[in-house]
């Protein structure tokens, strides 16, 4: 199941000044919890998605680290070739000298000021470790030491069946995309971590499929429809209803039901079935978190070799290096 980032939002009445900058801040950084090279995250006002400056075939520019996309891509406006065609390119990623990319055009409202040179999707992100903090990212070819992360207060979320450097460990019919687990009332479900989904209009957006919507309603959760948003997908223009839930917090847990964080300010966005793949086409309940959820944690670490995602506690109390698509 391929999930390719091609979303855009109709918001003609909303305009944001978009500026961005980034710099490589070191060959290695001893404060990185899993080692690796440190990069300053590119600043995009109102955005939460992680952009870094990388180099592909000698061209340097902003790349989105998109854990919600299963395939990596390069800008068709920069690299020669028709949209959708494949290109093998050298890429400045740990342990990867060259990789296959498809050529694409990017229409997301929030992008760095220099534009977007490419997307690093899970076909490559599943091959190395990434630690994200508020202002930095650490890319490492090494796995993490679980005992060290537990000592720093991070909680492991096992990715068995969902996200791994070993494709044979992925469940049938599932993409290789990292997840957490959500609890709302009596309903518990897995949710993909979509770092490329800029939910800046409705912060803490949780996309849900029809199966999850039906289960929530059947369990007695009251969903109050507050608005609709327009989304362009590979299947054309879609109207998606946006809901609030009053009086019931949303809990983020690991696979063993250990609570990591609880919030009351969130939105549910119903994704209708389409031909684009992803949770909308699944018959079992499923969800997808917007990138603004990254801001809730002191650190987020994707460790595909250990088949684990690590989440720090609430950012204001977390201990870590940070302390020393639009909807």
For the regions a protein language model found, what residue spans apply to each?
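Pepsin/retropepsin-fold aspartyl endopeptidases
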Residues: 20-327
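Positively charged n-region of N-terminal signal peptides that target proteins for export
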Residues: 1-6
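Bacterial N-terminal signal peptides
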Residues: 7-17
């Amino acid at each position: 199941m391929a999930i390719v980032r091609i979303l855009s939002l109709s918001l003609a009445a909303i305009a944001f000044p978009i500026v961005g900058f980034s710099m490589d801040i070191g060959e290695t950084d001893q404060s990185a919890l899993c080692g690796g090279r440190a990069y300053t995250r590119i600043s995009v006002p109102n955005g939460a998605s992680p952009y870094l400056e990388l180099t592909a075939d000698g061209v340097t520019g902003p790349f989105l680290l998109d854990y919600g996309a299963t395939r990596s891509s390069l800008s068709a406006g920069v690299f020669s070739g028709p949209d959708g065609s494949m290109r093998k390119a050298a890429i400045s990623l740990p342990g990867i000298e060259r990789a296959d990319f498809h050529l694409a055009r990017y229409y997301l409202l929030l992008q760095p000021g220099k534009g977007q040179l490419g997307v690093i999707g899970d076909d490559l992100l599943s091959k190395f470790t990434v630690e994200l903090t508020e202002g930095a990212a650490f890319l490492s070819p090494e796995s993490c030491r679980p005992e060290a992360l537990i000592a720093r207060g991070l909680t492991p979320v096992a990715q068995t069946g969902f996200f791994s450097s070993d494709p044979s460990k992925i469940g049938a019919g599932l993409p290789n995309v990292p997840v957490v687990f959500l609890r709302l009332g009596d309903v518990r479900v897995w949710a993909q971590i979509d770092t490329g989904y800029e939910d800046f209009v409705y912060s803490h957006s949780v996309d849900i499929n029809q199966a999850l919507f039906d289960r929530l309603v059947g369990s007695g959760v009251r969903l109050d429809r507050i608005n609709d948003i327009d989304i362009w997908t590979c299947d054309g223009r879609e109207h998606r209803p946006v809901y609030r839930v009053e009086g019931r917090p949303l809990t983020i847990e690991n696979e063993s039901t250990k609570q990591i964080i609880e919030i009351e300010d969130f939105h549910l966005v119903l994704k209708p079935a389409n031909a684009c793949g992803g949770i909308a086409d699944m018959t079992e309940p499923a969800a997808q978190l917007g990138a603004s959820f990254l801001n809730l944690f002191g650190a987020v670490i994707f460790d595909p070799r250990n088949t684990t995602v690590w989440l720090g506690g609430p950012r204001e109390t977390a201990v870590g290096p940070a302390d020393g698509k639009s909807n």
